[in-house]
């Protein structure tokens, strides 16, 4: 009889072709979940007066300097805070381990990370714990798809940071995050095409920028 874990992983692989199964560790897989919020997220990069890097804050909403809607950085000199609106944040890395006895006896093990660490370890631990809660609520049945789906839904609003929560990240990560946002935005832009009545064909966005007949 085929192992339930293998059946579930086969189904997950069919739904998410990008998932990577570990050839050396049976019933283990990894998937990167994109974080492309519905609305740009304002990210603050604070620095102390002496230039020292501050630790990230993941707190309820509070009053901070606002940034421009075009994604350009804004410096709040009074509070020594620089802000940027980002449309893309580094993906959430999910490592899945289905132990022997899953799903009937043991819960799946989920390990989460981001690189760079723009989400706090404390918050990632909370997300990981949600997986076991889902397994308990599902009466010890298969929940890998449901867990991935819950993370994808949370990513749509940047795990709450797209809805007013303040996201502060150390200056040491600023270049990496801005570079990621620029490259991801460019990649998404290049995938788009337009129907051109003059060229009589589809024209990629990068080229369409220079066509005055595109409206």
Q: What are these model-predicted stretches?
A:
Residues 21-136:
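Compact alpha/beta protein-protein interaction domains typified by the UBC
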Residues 154-213:
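Proximal pre-RING flanking segment of RING-type E3 ubiquitin ligases
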Residues 130-164:
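Acidic, low-complexity intrinsically disordered segments
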Residues 1-22:
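Eukaryotic proteins' extreme N-terminal regulatory segments
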Residues 15-18, 22, 100, 104, ...:
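Short amphipathic alpha-helical interaction elements and helix-loop-helix interfaces
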Residues 25-32, 111, 144, 148, ...:
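Short amphipathic alpha-helical segments embedded in low-complexity Lys/Glu-rich regions
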Residues 2-6, 85-88, 118-122, 138-145, ...:
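Intrinsic disorder
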Residues 7, 24-28, 89-91, 105, ...:
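Eukaryote-biased feature marking scaffold/signaling PDZ-domain proteins and nuclear chromatin regulators
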């Amino acid at each position: 009889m085929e192992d339930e874990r293998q059946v579930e992983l086969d189904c997950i692989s069919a739904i998410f072709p990008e998932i990577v199964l570990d050839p050396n560790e049976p019933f283990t897989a990894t998937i990167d979940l994109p974080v492309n919020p519905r609305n740009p997220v304002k990210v603050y990069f604070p620095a102390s007066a002496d230039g020292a890097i501050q630790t990230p804050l993941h707190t309820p909403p509070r009053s901070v300097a606002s940034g421009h809607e075009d994604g350009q950085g804004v410096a709040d000199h009074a509070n020594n805070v620089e802000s940027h609106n980002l449309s893309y944040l580094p993906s959430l890395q999910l490592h899945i381990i289905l132990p022997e006895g899953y799903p009937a006896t043991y819960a799946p093990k989920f390990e989460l990370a981001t690189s760079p660490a723009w989400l706090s370890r404390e918050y990632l631990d909370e997300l990981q714990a949600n997986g076991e809660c889902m397994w308990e609520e599902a009466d010890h049945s298969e929940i890998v798809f449901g867990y991935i789906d819950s993370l994808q839904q949370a990513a749509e609003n940047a795990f709450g940071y797209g809805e007013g929560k303040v996201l502060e990240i150390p200056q040491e990560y600023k270049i990496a995050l801005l570079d990621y946002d620029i490259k991801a935005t460019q990649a998404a832009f290049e995938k788009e095409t337009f129907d051109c009545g003059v060229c009589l064909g589809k024209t990629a966005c990068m080229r369409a920028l220079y066509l005055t007949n595109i409206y």
